[in-house]
């Protein structure tokens, strides 16, 4: 059978890739090992978080599905870092894992142009230097113009629970060994990574009265720009907080000799920022306790996820350490935690479109590219699906810049710097994070989503109206002035704001740390009729207008550098002043521009200056010939 696009895998990356492709008119096939598990959340029952919430909002602004499904299946919504600046705030939701999976599966199966097959892809079919289709374990052959690999942890997946090892892509599901061999046979460099998950506890056996309650926000904010914020009133369940203690640490330390992480049984590199509990105890011996978040997995709350206790220790040790924790003294484990090793593709072998450099029409997205997290996977899947469809339509690819989106930062980091450990998104990775906030993701990216046909007209026009209100409000603040007369001073005093001594632009008054939304509505009554989202934007943009302007100027300088193309026929070896290491990296990565070169790990500013000089010399020689 012939398709436009084949997506291998039905996880978070696979779903977004398949939906984007099908919604853009491509005849799409999703091949997945177990159709019932489309959209399954393999690890924690949550979407979003610091920087991850940004990704979900950006996915939504481009027309992706994750945010909307989270809003419909979420059972707790919180804004993390709410007391900090807007650039580092992050939306997070606990999801009902069952309903999330069922909803995603239903959406996939009901989407026009999208078919699903429950099979396992064993081999990629190659003609010349391009992929042309796949062969499955059932010996079925499917041809396609593009193939997107979104296999998650399934490539040679190996589960570890103490001394027990089991080939699996996820607990209870087959590993994909043949496809890993197929990728390797095509000359792609594969590495080995490791991640893990926590035990799930029977709710009946937990004493919640001995734990701290962590409720959701009183006025929850949805992820999706398509969700009606005024009517958003989800049923929310609390999470709970408890802590490890000295006894917990003793149990774990006395069983290091049984931990696959320390016995040499596990070879893959684990996530630095989400270590297992045994790794935490080993690395942070000075810590007297560690947070444990007890999170409901479904609305019925029959099982709880013990977040913070990811482990591959044997079952008897897991039970003992869990029962040493306050509130879990009588806990019964429904599912034990485990570690899983899996193959990944070195992402420096990919273009910014996520197409492989050496094999045409083959794309990789998600954990196969070395990332960790549902949100990072979904973002890559969406971009791979979009770019595969655009390539078939013979249209320009969508490559988001580091100044446009966290998705742009994510992909640029992967394809230029690569990763030796599971890559997780942080706000600190974004140079222009004050411009890349959650609250303005729609303004930044929805024009792309609308142009692609992934965002409907009604949603797009809602964004346009919001944008117009923001521009009108900021224009008022920047071009309206107040003078220190009696009326003005009385107004400021009534708002509990300090005096002004000179003629002052309203924007500078609003920029004060003490200035709130309520005060803004008094000072500028015209904005009272604006939407809540627009008013929030006006307040943020006004408060940080000087810093925002500085970042915009930095971006202009970056664009000048970005536009300097590196000629394909430039002889890198002939450039004196560059170290051999820099030359090797430039030849290996083949960056198209100076900016791309500057993002490669180990390429110094001095090397960029030298390269810039030689490019100018190269261009002059061309002109004189």
Swiss-Prot record:
The family line of this record is: Belongs to the MnmG family.
Identify the cofactor(s): FAD
Q: Which Pfam families match?
A: GIDA (PF01134), GIDA_C_1st (PF21680), SAM_GIDA_C (PF13932)
Task: Report residues binding NAD(+).
Answer: 270-284
* Compartment annotation: Cytoplasm
Could you identify this protein by its name? tRNA uridine 5-carboxymethylaminomethyl modification enzyme MnmG
Q: Which GO terms describe its biological process?
A: tRNA methylation; tRNA wobble uridine modification
Gene3D superfamilies recorded: FAD/NAD(P)-binding domain, GidA associated domain, C-terminal subdomain, tRNA uridine 5-carboxymethylaminomethyl modification enzyme MnmG/GidA
Subunit annotation: Homodimer. Heterotetramer of two MnmE and two MnmG subunits.
Going by the UniProt record, its keywords in alphabetical order are: Cytoplasm, FAD, Flavoprotein, NAD, tRNA processing
Functional description taken from the UniProt entry: NAD-binding protein involved in the addition of a carboxymethylaminomethyl (cmnm) group at the wobble position (U34) of certain tRNAs, forming tRNA-cmnm(5)s(2)U34.
Q: Which GO terms describe its molecular function?
A: flavin adenine dinucleotide binding
Query: What is the gene name?
Result: mnmG
Binding-site positions, FAD: 9-14, 121, 176, 367
Top-level taxonomic group:
Bacteria
Organism of derivation: Nitratiruptor sp. (strain SB155-2)
One GO cellular component term of this record is: cytosol
């Amino acid at each position: 059978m012939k398709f436009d696009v084949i997506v291998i895998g039905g996880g978070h990356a696979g779903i977004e890739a398949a939906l984007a492709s099908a919604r853009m008119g491509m005849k799409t096939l999703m091949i997945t090992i177990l159709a019932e598990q489309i959209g399954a959340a393999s690890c924690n029952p949550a979407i979003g978080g610091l920087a991850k919430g940004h990704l979900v909002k950006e996915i939504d602004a481009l027309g992706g599905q994750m945010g909307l499904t989270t809003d419909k299946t979420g059972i707790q919504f919180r804004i993390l870092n709410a007391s900090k600046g807007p650039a580092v705030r992050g939306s997070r939701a606990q999801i009902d894992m069952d309903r999330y999976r069922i909803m995603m599966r239903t959406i996939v199966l009901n989407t026009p142009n999208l078919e699903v097959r429950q099979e396992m892809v064993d081999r990629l079919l190659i003609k010349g230097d391009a992929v042309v289709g796949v062969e499955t374990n059932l010996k079925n052959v499917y041809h396609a113009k593009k193939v997107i690999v979104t296999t998650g942890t399934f490539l040679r997946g190996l589960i570890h629970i103490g001394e027990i090892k089991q080939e699996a892509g996820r607990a209870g599901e087959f590993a994909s060994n043949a496809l890993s061999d197929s990728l390797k046979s095509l000359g792609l460099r594969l590495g080995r990574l490791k991640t893990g998950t926590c035990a799930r506890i029977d709710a009946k056996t937990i004493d919640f009265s001995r734990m701290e309650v962590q409720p959701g926000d009183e006025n929850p904010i949805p992820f999706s720009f398509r969700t009606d914020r005024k009517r958003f009133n989800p049923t929310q369940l609390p999470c709970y907080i408890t802590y490890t203690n000295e006894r917990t640490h003793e149990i774990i330390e006395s069983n290091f000799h049984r931990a696959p992480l320390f016995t040499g049984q596990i070879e893959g590199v684990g996530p630095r920022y989400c270590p297992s509990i045994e790794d935490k105890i080993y690395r942070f011996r000075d810590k007297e306790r560690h947070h444990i978040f007890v999170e409901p997995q479904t609305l019925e709350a029959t099982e709880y996820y013990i977040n913070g206790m990811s482990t591959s220790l044997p079952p008897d040790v897991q039970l003992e350490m869990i029962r040493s924790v306050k509130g879990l003294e009588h806990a019964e484990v429904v599912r034990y935690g485990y570690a899983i090793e899996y193959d990944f593709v070195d992402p420096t072998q990919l273009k910014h479109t996520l197409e492989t450099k050496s094999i045409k029409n083959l794309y990789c997205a998600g954990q196969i590219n070395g990332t960790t997290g549902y949100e990072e996977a979904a973002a890559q899947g969406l971009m791979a699906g979009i770019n595969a469809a655009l390539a078939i339509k013979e249209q320009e690819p969508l490559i988001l810049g580091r100044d446009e989106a966290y998705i742009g930062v994510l992909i640029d980091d992967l394809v230029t710097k690569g990763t030796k450990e599971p890559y997780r998104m942080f706000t600190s990775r974004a140079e222009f994070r004050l411009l890349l906030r959650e609250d303005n993701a729609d303004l930044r990216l929805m024009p792309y989503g609308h142009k692609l046909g992934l965002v409907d007209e009604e949603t797009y026009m809602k964004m346009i109206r919001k944008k117009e209100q923001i521009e009108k409000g900021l224009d008022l603040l920047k071009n309206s002035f107040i003078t220190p007369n009696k009326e003005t001073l009385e107004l400021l005093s009534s708002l509990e704001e300090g005096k002004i001594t000179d003629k002052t632009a309203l924007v500078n008054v609003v920029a004060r740390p003490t200035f709130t939304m309520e005060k803004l509505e008094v000072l500028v009554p015209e904005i009272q009729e604006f939407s809540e989202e627009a008013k929030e934007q006006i307040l943020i943009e006004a408060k940080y207008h000087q810093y925002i302007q500085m970042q915009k100027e930095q971006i202009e300088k970056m664009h000048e550098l970005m536009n300097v193309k590196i000629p394909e026929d430039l002889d890198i070896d002939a450039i004196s002043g560059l170290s051999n290491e820099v030359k090797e990296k430039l030849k290996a990565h083949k960056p198209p521009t100076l900016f791309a070169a500057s993002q490669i790990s180990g390429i110094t500013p001095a090397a960029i200056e030298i390269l810039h000089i030689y490019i100018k010399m190269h261009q002059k020689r061309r002109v004189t010939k």
